[in-house]
C-alpha cells in the first residue's frame, strides 16, 4: 500500500515521504495513529496545502522532546521489588513499570517509548534503559533495582 507520512517514522521515512508498506502495518498502526494517510491524488494535494503547518508542528514536538530529554538524560530512579537471596527478582521490572515510575516523577512517557535492550530487568542492581521521546531524541536513564528480601 502506498502511504504518505504525516510525521517522521523510525526506519521508514520523514514527513511528506511517499512510501510503500505492507497493508497490515498501514491499516493497523500507521493510519489509526495518524502517522500516515493513503497516498491518493486527493490526499497528496491536501498534504501539500498543509505541509508548512505539519512541519511547524513536527518542529515544535522535536523541541519539546529535546527539552524533556535534557532534563531526563542521565537521571537515576529507584524501584523496589521482592527478591530472593541470590539477587534474582520474583517477577521482573518491565517497560510499563519504568513508564509508571517516570510518570510519578513528572515525565510524560508512554510504555512503548521505554526500550529495554536486554528485556525486562530480573536482577538487583543498576540497569541502563533507553527512553525514546521522539524518533530523534533517545536518552539513557538508570534504573536502580533494590531487592526486598522475602
Swiss-Prot record:
Pfam families: Ribosomal_L9_C (PF03948), Ribosomal_L9_N (PF01281). InterPro entries: Ribosomal_bL9 (IPR000244), Ribosomal_bL9/RNase_H1_N (IPR009027), Ribosomal_bL9_bac/chp (IPR020594), Ribosomal_bL9_C (IPR020069), Ribosomal_bL9_C_sf (IPR036791), Ribosomal_bL9_N (IPR020070), Ribosomal_bL9_N_sf (IPR036935). The keyword RNA-binding applies. The keyword rRNA-binding applies. GO terms for cellular component: ribonucleoprotein complex; ribosome. PROSITE patterns: RIBOSOMAL_L9. Keywords: Ribonucleoprotein, Ribosomal protein, RNA-binding, rRNA-binding. One of its GO terms (molecular function) is structural constituent of ribosome. GO terms for biological process: translation. Binds to the 23S rRNA. NCBIfam families: L9 (TIGR00158). Belongs to the bacterial ribosomal protein bL9 family. This is Large ribosomal subunit protein bL9. The gene is rplI.
Amino acid at each position: 500500500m502506498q502511504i504518505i507520512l504525516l510525521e517522521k517514522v523510525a526506519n521508514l521515512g520523514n514527513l511528506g515521504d511517499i512510501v510503500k508498506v505492507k497493508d497490515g502495518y498501514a491499516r493497523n498502526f500507521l493510519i489509526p495513529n495518524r502517522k500516515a494517510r493513503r497516498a491518493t491524488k486527493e490526499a497528496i494535494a491536501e498534504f501539500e496545502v498543509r505541509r508548512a503547518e505539519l512541519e511547524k508542528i513536527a518542529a515544535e514536538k522535536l523541541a519539546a522532546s529535546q527539552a524533556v530529554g535534557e532534563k531526563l538524560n542521565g537521571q537515576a530512579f529507584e524501584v523496589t521489588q521482592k527478591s530472593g537471596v541470590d539477587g534474582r527478582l520474583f517477577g521482573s521490572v518491565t517497560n510499563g513499570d519504568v513508564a509508571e515510575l517516570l510518570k510519578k516523577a513528572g515525565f510524560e512517557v508512554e510504555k512503548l517509548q521505554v526500550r529495554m535492550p536486554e528485556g525486562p530487568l530480573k536482577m538487583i542492581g543498576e540497569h541502563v534503559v533507553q527512553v525514546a521521546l521522539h524518533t530523534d531524541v533517545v536518552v539513557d536513564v538508570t534504573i536502580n533495582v533494590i531487592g526486598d528480601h522475602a
